[in-house]
Amino acid sequence: MNDDIKAKALNIQFLLDYQKDSVVSREVLKKELGTITFFAFDQGKGLSEHSAPFDAFVQVIDGEAEITISGKTHTVSSGEFIIMPANEPHALQAVISPFKMILTMIKSN
C-alpha cells in the first residue's frame, strides 16, 4: 500500500489507468484481515477461473464485467456489485468493454 493515498479524498477513476491488452491491479490497502485492490481490465482480458477461501465483494466502477460464479454468468455494470462466495469457482472477463473494479476481501469465517 502506498502512503501517498492515505487521508486524502481521491477520485477512484484516476488511481488506475487502462493498459492495452492488460489487466492492471493496485493494492490500496492490505491488512492481516483483508485487502482492497483496484483492477483495470482492457477489453478481451480477464482472470481465469479460480477460487478463494473467503467471500469477495466486487464493485464495478467503470464499464461492464462478465463474472462467472460456479458456472453461472452475471453481467455487472458500473455502479453495481456482486459477492463471489468463498470456495466457489469464479472468473472475470471484459467481454463487452474495458472495466474497472474494486475487490474487497475480508479474511474471516
What do these predicted regions represent?
Residues A40-D42, P53-I67:
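Short, conserved beta-strand element in jelly-roll/cupin
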Residues G71-A86:
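Short acidic-glycine-tyrosine-enriched beta hairpin
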Residues A86-N109:
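Ligand-binding loop in jelly-roll beta-barrel domains
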Residues T35, E64-E66, T73, P89, ...:
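Structural motif
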Residues S22, I36-A52:
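Conserved short histidine dyad/triad with adjacent acidic residue
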